[in-house]
Curated annotation (Swiss-Prot):
Sequence ranges of Polar residues compositional bias: 401-456, 484-521, 534-555, 568-641
Keyword presence, Lipoprotein: yes
CDD domains found in the cross-reference section: GH18_hevamine_XipI_class_III
Membrane disposition: Lipid-anchor; GPI-anchor
Descriptive protein name: Endochitinase 2
Bias-annotated ranges (Low complexity): 346-400, 457-483, 522-533, 556-567, 642-652, 659-672
Residue ranges occupied by any GH18 domain in the UniProt entry: 29-340
Protein source organism: Coccidioides posadasii (strain C735)
Length: 855
């Protein structure tokens, strides 16, 4: 690979990593803000520095091709662009601005800060008029938007108003003309998004609150939108202010809109409550105070957690000028959202660049070194192990490393998990450690050996690719573990009052793993089984003092039953990796098992009869597999996901919600424990040539001492269940996946878990305009035939960004054009005009502008 190819690959990987810091589209507390039409507005980079903004909608494309000169669209971004326009090849002047140098410079900064930037079409300026007149016009308009404002491609020879920078999607704020053509545009854009499978693009709508919306109801009902920014202002019959004052006086409420969205082209689209940012931003009687906003947000976030997405604020400059307690209005609204969110999660995304690992543990501490490229909200620190323990672990040729460390008092414990893609031995030796567990998995042959003396606790760890696990015990504090997988291969070991136990497993796909435990004077047993194919391991033991069960699986179902036992194990099903950390306080105490969620998980919890205590904990989101069919003579159905077989157990009682009950233990003060899970998994997506499989690695962090388990909301009748944290479901059209264009539903990771906290350091940017000649290009060619397909409903996942106080910006605004707000309807938009002052400035600076424009 030459230097050029290496550089290109590095840029591509870096771009993907930066994108991973962006929006969590299915959180309940996202804040969207419109920008581009404020009087004397600050530039885009100033607002991107604000930690409260998740989505910034840039407005507007206010001239549509059917009304624009030469069949081109036109734009208006207030004072952020020079009065310079594109010309066609034959010399026709269009209304599309080509002097938006500040936006060109600011968009990459906004992307680096994790902001999602949408380009809005339409707007509500009184003197504007726009509409789509034909299906051909709708298709060409969508193609033009993607070519001009989407990712830069060598095939596009038309204009690029924002240069090489691209937006993250498009917003439809249609308040003029008719409702024709917009569903066609949305479906076409969904097809075009497939050309850039490494990035996520969004489509939003901003209807008036009156139902049905005159201009967007047809598009919302017949195409897939990700976000619905409802303008609950400027219409007294459905304003949010009126609902707060007297809910019974409102004709159309959030409840009505939720019902409508759940029957729309995307039943899992997120609803945003749109509010004016000040009394002057819209009708002054529709302005809500923070207390009034809290009332409506807390009510509907709790009532519709799967549909509620956050708030939309019109607009950024009005918010900046309306400060409450020193904070802009939008920042206050973000704080309202975060306070109302019952369970704001945290997460870490990691990209591994090196597989070398070295682990050494002295009698006082353990040091682990891993070369990784990571973005983390939790600083890493070395783990420590209690004195009187010596461990040595070597690993070579590995391709992915997982390390999880748990600390407790009397006794502390350390868990080390290492994965390898080649044959390697891993040996661990320990003398008198309170608790040590070593787990290694490999794609070929590997051996794990553990030796310990007088360990007071027992740990059983099972990893598999497709397994069922059941646990049962009768009239004994001991526990019986049985693991089954679909293919053949069985090894069974039974032990009664034996000081040591050896379990070996085998699978039909030339995988061999051995776990050996030697102990003296201890009733403990250590079992470790992992496979990517078929394995069956059954172990039975009596008179063991304590047992902990840890399960990791990729589609797995686990059922547990117990009669007259002292504890209850955990049962989980997952589509990826799951990590369970065990903490014990002494050799005589019962144990507690905490399990973390993994993508596409489902939990089944069983209860024992006649047991003095129960221990079970699982936090997960049920997953439904969504399939879509394209009607034709030979229907094509694309189904994503891998359903698992049902659980087989003698007696199973499933409670309505997972719960957590801690087993009795001795009174001991514990150190704070943090559970970190590194997950490597694969998913299917669509590229221009068809289906492709992508392998990713990401990390989640969980602190059981400070976090509380919240019962999963019961599924809404008729509504698909959302995917788990960090994952989302997209609906798109794949022309290459079947003989005819087919709508597919894909479960993929979000572009990021969360945006890490930013520092107070603020960049100082000096903007130097670069001379640039007007670009003269022809109108993009018209597209061919279009096949209308039915889109399926993407699933949802909920995750919340941690709030950070906004920082001020030292960036000086250098407007190159000028405009001020005029009369508006709905979401107000300014009409761009050349005022007298601007003309005088241009006349006075003729020489400079002549050089600037290349004349």
């Amino acid at each position: 690979m030459g230097p050029t190819n290496i550089l290109a690959a590095f840029i591509a990987v870096s771009s993907l990593f930066i994108q991973s810091l962006a929006l969590n589209p299915y959180a309940k507390s996202n804040l969207a803000v419109y920008w581009g039409q404020g009087a004397g507005q600050n530039r885009l980079s100033y607002f991107c520095e604000k930690t409260s903004f998740d989505i910034i909608v840039v407005g507007f494309i206010n001239v549509f091709p059917d009304q624009g000169p030469a069949g081109w669209p036109g734009s208006n971004f207030g004072n952020q662009c020079a009065d310079s326009y594109y010309y066609t090849k034959n010399g026709t002047k269009t209304k599309l601005l080509d002097g938006c140098y500040q936006i060109k410079e600011d968009l990459p900064k906004c992307k680096a800060l994790g902001k999602t930037i949408l380009l809005s079409l339409g707007g509500g300026a009184v003197h504007d008029f726009y509409e789509v007149k034909s299906e051909e016009s709708a298709l060409n308009f969508a193609d033009f938007l993607w070519g001009a404002f989407g990712p830069l491609t060598p095939d596009w020879t038309g204009p690029r108003p924002f240069g090489e920078a691209s937006v993250d999607g498009f917003d439809f704020d249609i308040e003029k003309g008719s409702n024709f053509g917009y569903s066609i545009m949305v479906r076409r854009l969904r097809e075009l998004f497939l050309q850039d499978p490494l990035n996520r693009y969004y489509i939003s709508a901003a209807p008036q609150c009156i139902m049905p919306d005159k201009y967007l109801s047809h598009a919302i009902s017949n195409s897939a939108f990700d976000f619905i920014f409802i303008q609950f202002y400027n219409n007294p019959s459905c304003s949010a202010k009126r609902w707060v004052t007297n809910p019974k006086s409102v004709t159309y409420t959030v409840d009505d809109w939720v019902k409508y969205i759940r029957k729309s082209g995307n039943p899992l689209a997120k609803l945003f409550i749109g509010l004016p940012a000040s009394k002057s931003a819209a009708a002054k009687e529709d302005y809500l105070t923070p207390g009034e906003a809290t009332k409506i947000v807390s009510t509907y976030m709790a009532k519709y957690p799967s549909t509620f997405g956050g708030m939309m604020v019109w607009e950024a400059t009005a918010s900046e000028n309306n400060k409450l307690g020193g904070l802009p209005y939008a920042d206050i609204m973000k704080e309202v959202l975060l306070r109302c969110d019952p369970d704001p999660p945290t997460s870490t995304v990691t990209s591994t660049t090196s597989a070398s690992t070295s682990t050494q543990t002295s009698s006082q501490s353990t040091t682990m070194e891993t070369k990784t490229l990571s973005a983390s909200t939790t600083p890493s620190s070395p783990s420590t192990v209690s004195p009187s323990s010596t461990m040595q672990t070597t690993s070579t040729g590995s391709t992915s490393i997982e390390t999880v460390t748990t600390r407790s008092q009397e006794p502390p414990s350390t868990t080390i998990s290492t994965r390898s893609a080649s044959t390697e031995p891993v040996t661990t030796r320990s003398q008198e450690p309170p608790s040590t567990t070593i787990s290694t998995r490999s794609a070929s042959t590997e051996t794990v050996t553990t030796r310990s003396q007088e360990p007071p606790s027992t740990t059983i760890s099972t990893w598999s690719a497709s397994t069922e696990t059941s646990t049962s015990s009768q009239d004994s504090p001991s526990t019986t573990i049985s693991t089954k997988s679909a293919p053949t291969g069985t090894v069974t070991t039974r032990s009664q009052d034996l000081p040591s136990t050896t379990i070996s497993t085998r699978s039909p796909e030339t995988e061999t793993e051995t776990a050996t435990t030697k102990s003296q004077g201890s009733p403990s047993i250590t079992l470790s089984t992992r496979s990517s194919s078929a394995e069956t391991v059954s172990t039975r033991s009596q008179h063991s003092s304590s047992t902990t069960i840890s399960t990791k699986s990729a589609p797995t179902e686990t059922g547990t039953t117990s009669e007259h036992s002292t504890s209850m194990p955990v049962s989980t099903r997952s589509a990826s990796t799951e990590t369970v950390i065990t903490r014990s306080q002494n050799s005589d105490s019962q144990s507690m098992t905490v399990s973390t969620r993994s993508p596409s998980t489902e939990s089944i919890t069983t209860r024992s009869q006649g047991s003095p205590s129960e221990t079970f904990s699982t936090k997960s989101v049920p997953v439904d597999t969504i399939s879509t069919e394209l009607p034709s003579q030979t229907p094509t159905t694309i189904i994503t996901g891998t359903p698992s077989d049902p659980v087989s157990a003698p007696t199973t009682t499933v409670p309505p919600n997972p719960t957590l009950t801690l087993a009795p233990s001795s009174s001991t003060t514990e150190d704070r424990t943090t559970i970190t899970t590194i997950i490597t998994t694969s998913y299917v997506t669509v590229c221009p040539t068809g289906f492709t499989t992508v392998t990713i690695t990401y990390t989640t962090t969980y602190c059981p001492e400070t976090a509380s388990l919240t019962p999963t909301q019961p599924p809404i009748p008729g509504a698909p269940a959302p995917p788990p944290d960090g994952w989302t479901t997209i609906v798109t059209v794949c022309p290459q996946c079947a003989p005819t264009p087919t709508t597919v539903t894909l479960t993929v990771p979000t572009r990021s878990a969360f945006l890490p906290a930013r520092t107070e350091t603020r960049p100082v940017v000096t903007v130097v305009p670069v001379p640039e000649n007007p670009i003269k290009n022809v109108k993009p060619s018209e597209s061919g035939d279009f096949v209308t397909v039915t889109t399926a409903a993407p699933a949802t996942v909920t995750k919340t960004l941690e709030y950070n106080n906004p920082v001020d910006s030292d960036v000086n605004v250098q407007p190159t054009g000028g405009s001020s707000p005029v009369e508006f309807e709905g979401s107000a938009m300014t009409v761009r005009s050349m005022d007298v002052v601007a003309k005088a400035l241009i006349t006075a600076g003729a020489a400079v502008l002549g050089l600037f424009l290349g004349l």
